[in-house]
Regions:
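Universal eukaryotic N-terminal targeting presequences
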Residues: 1-3
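The substrate-binding groove and active-site-proximal loops of carbohydrate-active enzymes
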Residues: 407
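Active-site catalytic microenvironments in core metabolic enzymes, especially phosphate/sugar-handling
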Residues: 475-478, 613
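Charged catalytic cores and adjacent phosphate/nucleic-acid-binding surfaces used
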Residues: 6-10, 18, 209-210, 214-223, ...
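Two-metal-ion RNase H-like nuclease active-site motif
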Residues: 200-202, 399-403, 477
């Protein structure tokens, strides 16, 4: 896959055609237009891609249907050449010769596009006249006053470039789910208490529990007469770093850490989120970041439609709109209308003709669908499914298997971790300290591992004597070495109840290709005593991508081994820094007969509560309690692991 500064040609779907979604096609067309402009292409060629992307964005028909029927050139703004590109992408999964365009543009030029106020024309100018190819080089040039003498520049424009770079550094990038929830739940709770607000709900990718989010979307039910007052109350909130806009129905702000300084109405917070984010210490958490937020105020009778629309995803909404059209209805953020009834009326003017809805479930009922939980709204089969899964709840978890103590790099003792699990109502806790090769994390020597095994046995005996319904499982997070073998010898691992196999020697794995890494992981899961494949790709959200691996092939092999009577489990590492296994693979794991373990990878007692985040990812991946290993009882697990 060709990639430049985070821009890339998307991978084709495995179950195509169609091999790409409309969203993918639009993104590629938008990116190609920019790349062509940076290269100095003919302005009409650039505009053709810009127009095509805009046209597809407003196309209500199903793109795959239009493509199959050969009607792309009938769509205004799509010429023969671009129609051919779209057809190839949808039917074959490939993108013609535009991959060479991605490869030809220096990555730094793409990165500069994120600087506020800077577009392709100026970036091209800086590159051609001064050879600038990175944000840092641009900063130095501006500080040295070398930009002001260029065409269409000056001292003020130069200063704006520096201001833009400073803003980018402060506000750029996506946020992890936990950061989004930290701000989002608090902001929603604050708005819910404002006079004039009847209902409010966090929407967008945060509500859908995406692993990272771009900004916050909140929908509030407010009568028109109260909008001005509610707007004033929002703008009076503490910690607003900037106001991007405040109109008649929408307020756009940037929130900073100071938002938490005066305390948050915790009575309005989700209990699971509150516990996962730090419990009573929630208000004291330092996020060291900012986040954009949009608050949309709509009349109460419109609220369910606006909430559904801004929850998304775009792809899910497109499918809903098409389903509505198939039934003679029109669906948007203001309502669900019989097409014949509203004519040319739009927006709130048409809302009085809408079919009634007090909750989102009513919208789905009108469209002859079961209610789709927000986590599933990604156009991954939720519309077609005859029955949707009963998604796992965090309360169904009875323990976890991947946790650390002071024996390696944890900050709590074996006894403290066990007591924290007991306090959470769990039946068991699995310990998996690092293995000997990971000295940076104080990995245990074989002798230390055996000593820990004895400590676990002694604690279990004491609980059994005291009739306490709790036990520890003794495991190890054994490094998967580059050749796919496990740290420690088989004899040294024999004292363990379970083995969590994880990759930590990332430099080697990151350098290798997909085939080598896949073969090594498959070799690892084929080891008789490997129980759980831990954080399968090694990614750190916002820090590094995972190593290349064919996860489908790995999960397929694990399923084969399970069919032969073994127990091979894949982990959703619930740390909000990882959330790995990615939710996109969860349904496939289930189909292959591979159980999932939601593990917090806890290094402290508070870290145990990260399982809540892992549960959100499991839900997003269509998983039920029966798919989760640690929803089973301690007695069941004793039989499985021994």
């Amino acid at each position: 896959m060709v990639s430049v500064a985070g821009w890339s040609l998307p991978r084709p779907r495995r179950n195509g055609p169609p091999f790409h979604s409309k969203s993918n096609v639009i993104t590629v067309l938008e990116q190609v237009a920019v790349l062509l402009e940076l290269e100095g292409a003919n302005v009409f060629r650039v505009r053709s891609y810009q127009n095509a992307s805009r046209t597809l964005g407003s196309l209500e028909e199903d793109l795959w249907t239009v493509t199959q029927e050969g009607r792309l050139t009938d769509v205004k703004g799509i010429g023969k050449g671009i129609a051919g590109l779209i057809t190839e992408a949808m039917t074959e999964g490939t993108w013609g010769d535009i991959s060479s365009l991605y490869a030809s543009v220096p990555p730094g030029l793409i990165q500069m596009l994120a600087i506020p106020g800077l577009g392709p024309k100026k970036i091209k100018l800086f590159h051609e006249e001064l050879g600038i190819e990175s944000i840092e080089e641009l900063r130095v040039a501006a500080e040295d006053e070398r930009l002001r003498n260029l065409e269409r520049m000056g001292a003020k424009s130069e200063a704006k470039v520096l201001d833009g770079i400073a803003l980018l550094e402060r506000f750029s990038g996506r946020r992890r789910l936990d950061v989004g929830l930290l701000y989002g739940e608090a902001l929603e709770a604050s708005i819910a208490e404002m006079k004039g607000v009847e209902r409010t709900q966090l929407a967008g990718s945060t509500r859908r529990r995406k692993e990272t989010i771009g900004d916050l979307d909140i929908v509030a039910a407010v009568n028109p007469a109260d909008v001005a007052s509610v707007t004033e109350q929002i703008l009076a909130l503490p910690g607003i770093a900037d106001v991007k806009g405040a109109g008649s129905s929408k307020v756009s702000i940037i929130l900073g850490t100071e938002f938490f300084d005066s305390g948050i109405p915790s009575t309005g917070l989700d209990g699971g989120v509150l516990a996962a984010l730090g419990g009573e210490a929630y208000e004291e958490l330092a996020t060291n970041t900012t986040i954009d937020a949009q608050i949309r105020m709509v009349p109460p009778h419109v609220f369910p439609f606006t909430l559904a629309y801004f929850t998304g995803s775009k792809e899910h909404n497109v499918r809903l709109r098409q389903r509505a059209l198939d039934r003679g209805l029109r669906l948007n953020e203001f309502g669900l209308f019989p097409v014949d009834a509203v004519g040319e009326l739009k927006g709130l003017e048409a809302a009085e003709f809408s079919l009634p809805a007090t909750e989102e479930a009513d919208i789905y009922r009108h469209l002859e669908l079961d209610y789709v939980p927000p986590e599933l709204r990604e156009d991954t089969g939720e519309i077609e499914a005859s029955t949707l899964p009963s998604l796992v709840e965090a309360s169904a978890l009875k323990g976890a298997f991947h946790n650390h103590t002071t024996a390696s790099d944890g900050v709590a003792s074996l006894e403290q971790m066990a007591q924290a699990a007991i306090d959470m109502g769990w039946e068991y806790l699995g310990i998996a300290d690092h293995s000997q090769i990971l000295q940076i994390a104080s990995g245990l020597s074989p002798g230390e591992l055996l000593e820990q095994s004895e400590s676990v046995r002694a604690l279990n005996e004491s609980w059994a004597d005291g009739k306490k319904d709790f036990r520890l499982f003794h495991g190890s997070e054994c490094d998967i070495l580059p050749d796919g073998t496990l740290d420690y010898t088989a004899a040294e691992r024999a004292c363990l109840d379970h083995v969590v196999g994880s990759v930590h020697q990332l430099p080697t794995w990151m350098k290798r290709d997909e085939d080598e890494n896949t073969a090594a992981l498959i070799h690892a899961v084929e080891q008789d005593d490997l129980t759980i494949l831990g954080h399968p790709t090694g990614r750190i959200l916002g820090g590094r991508d995972g190593f290349e691996v064919d996860m489908h092939a790995v999960l397929r092999r694990m399923g084969e081994l399970n069919a032969e009577g073994e127990l091979k489990v894949v982990e959703i590492n619930a740390s909000p820094y990882r959330l790995d296994l990615d939710w996109r693979f969860c349904k496939f794991a289930k189909e292959q007969g591979v159980p999932v373990a939601i593990n917090p990878d806890a290094h402290s007692t508070q870290g145990l509560k990260d399982v809540w985040f892992g549960t959100q990812i499991a839900r997003k991946g269509w998983l039920e309690a029966t798919d989760i290993l640690n929803c089973r009882s301690g007695a069941d697990l004793e039989r499985l692991l021994w």
